[in-house]
Amino acid sequence: MTTPNKINFPPPKLQIDFAFALKRFRAVYLQSALLETVRDMDIAELDRQLSKYVPPADLATLAQYGLRAELLFAVPAVLEANPHLLGYYRLLMGYSQKEFYGRDKGFGVGCFKSMEEKGKAGKAAVADLHDLCVAFCATASALLAGVGPLRVSRELLDDLTLLTVGPQLRGGANNQRGADGIVLVFEIIREIVAHAAAEVRESAIEVNSATGRPVLIEFAPDPDIIIREEMENQHYRNVVAIEVKSGTDVSNIHNRIGEAEKSHQKARQLGFTECWTVVNVGRLDMVKARSESPSTDRFYSLTALSLRAGDEYADFRRRVLSLTAIPARPANP
């Protein structure tokens, strides 16, 4: 019989997911994808464009290290052959997707996003491809000069792209966790009201309430889940707004609660009578949480709700049934 260890760590699920995601990234966005693309290109035409876009001194520096210039410098021929490689050059220069493509604080190059994500260039992107490459080459030249004291190598350039990929993968994992949490809360509500459901769709549940008026439980962009009573055709009484914060990082939970407060303030303006916030951390300072989101009527733990048992789940269930005006499921005889 083995003695239980005093120290236990959770399984490295995030790193396992990252390993598979990185494999996909390498095949589409990283250096191996660039090398595969260049292998099938007209090298004479590629060299002609490189001599046009890249300063001669930079070409000489790369040649000194036995490197081809397209490893660092973007030219139209490469991006036309494989539009996904826009992602390679973005990552190499250290720009996040939000920073690069963002509508409010981005670089004004949102029209190129479909190249990276879908491998397709729209009319606006095609028209501005020259300017994009000029801008990339200027930045690449600054990067080459900045790392001058180091020996530039394929390995170094690959490492630089990975430094940008890491936060992007983590951000994607966080977004997926957030989406999964919202779906879980929606599913828990669906189970609670299933016996009174008139219609269940992918993004909404319609239930028959005791008032005789339909009640809709729906996914929404902001807040995450809403419950509304239909007074007459296309006229609603807003009942409950639910914000789900699925992140498990305790150090960041108060920022997330602040985000929930902004959403709930909007919900109050829209006439929602109840605002709930579901969180996914083990220890929450309720005094601080209530001060950060005074609009939140009830805080719930995602873990407690997912158990489908216990005082917290029972309170959540009672309130859902009460505010949707439907009776509890009849007990089995």
Swiss-Prot record:
Its EC number is 3.1.21.4. It is an enzyme of class 3 (hydrolase). It comes from the Bacteria. One of its GO terms (biological process) is DNA restriction-modification system. The keyword Nuclease applies. It holds the Pfam family RE_XcyI. GO terms for molecular function: DNA binding; magnesium ion binding; type II site-specific deoxyribonuclease activity. Belongs to the XcyI type II restriction endonuclease family. Monomer. This is Type II restriction enzyme XcyI. The gene is xcyIR.
